[in-house]
Amino acid sequence: MFDGMTAETLARMQFAFTVSFHIIFPAFSIGVASYLAVLNGLWLRTRDDTYLTLFNYWKKIFAVAFGMGVVSGIVMSYQFGTNWSVFSDKTGPVLGPLMAYEVLSAFFLEAGFLGIMLFGRERVGDKLHMFATAMVAFGTLMSATWILSVNSWMQTPAGYSINELGQFVPEDWWQIVFNPSFPYRLVHMVLAAYLTTALVVGGVGGLHLLRNRKDAPARRMFSMAMWMLIVVAPLQILAGDFHGINTLEHQPAKVMAMEGHYDSHPDGAPLILFGIPNPDEKRIDYAVQIPQVSSLILKHAWGAPLDGLDTIPDEDEPPVAIIFWSFRVMVGLGFAMLGLGAWAAWQRYRGRLYDTQLLHRAAIVMGPTGFVAVLAGWITTEVGRQPFTVYGLLRTSDSLAPVAAPAVAASLLAFIMVYFFIFGAGTFYLLRMMNAPTSKPDPELKEGPIRTAGITPTMQSDPDLIPGE
């Protein structure tokens, strides 16, 4: 199955496989945790039981997703010590403390308050329960902050020196944590998590509205999700624009691959909408493009010059085809999310938000696209950094542990089988929970006389139920 592949290729495949499974759960957990905090706060403020019903509905889904995220994340840490021990040795003085801070602060905060949030409402009081819910939401955001700081440092390293052993040594922790790409990546990822959650909530709400458009919790969750889409989707597009400009400054080869610019454009670069990258001929075949627009987007100036991959040595060039397509999947889905939010806003204005079945079906179809967009975005980010693990300083080929290809292949095959079984079952269970009714139906009254617990029959007013007649 993996014949002819090197240990480096297999190790990269293994990490890509495990991190792809992992990222979808934290992305969902971040959004759902904040959603639960909002629901709990609204219930405390209004005492509207619809919010409490939604809180109880989504907290169970959050618990399962959170657990799957924790389990899938453990595996990746072991790979740093097995397949990528050289990387761990060289970057450990910088990245080790950051990852420890994530555990000591964010994860402990989440773990400490999670039980109170899930089971403590009747035991600790409403206000303390609200505090616990807010702390879980804050913990997920803090966890994202530390992990994205680590990843951003690998993309745009700062605040370090290199000792005689070739290790990165911290010199300025402020520069390390708040490295040049960190603020943009943090905002972009958190907004992606909120969009992902809004799409899932909207899809679930749309499903239940198709079954019963009078379902009050379904109406509320669908309305909240559509508000989130129309507000956050434009912000995400704007954040992506700023992130792209920052990436052009610090990682120009990545942006050149994203845009498909093999050649430099001294008089302005076109925006290539679609095409087929041809790495052998260094061109985009069958390109559909709009003149000058790439320069306008990246430099906010019509006709501004843009360098191409012809200015990058071949050995430093990232895999263009993968980045080219993953970037377009991410951007295309982003605009589709904006379109869904705008459609919902129009139907809300017309007073038909809960009556337009086509909109509800579209929300169901769009439900999983947030996860696809997150995966496409991370493929763009991580593959675009190649051939480096620490951009411009440490190559991927120099980060690998001295492991044999058959050993990596065996562990990769084991991961594939175990992951699809365990996380497939977990995902199936999550889908069943989302398919369940938003609230328990009232027990149906049986036909016939209603009697008390005693032996005396109750008075009946229905002549059809009077015995003997």
Summary of predicted features, one role per range:
Residues M1-E469:
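Polytopic transmembrane helical bundles with strong interfacial aromatic enrichment
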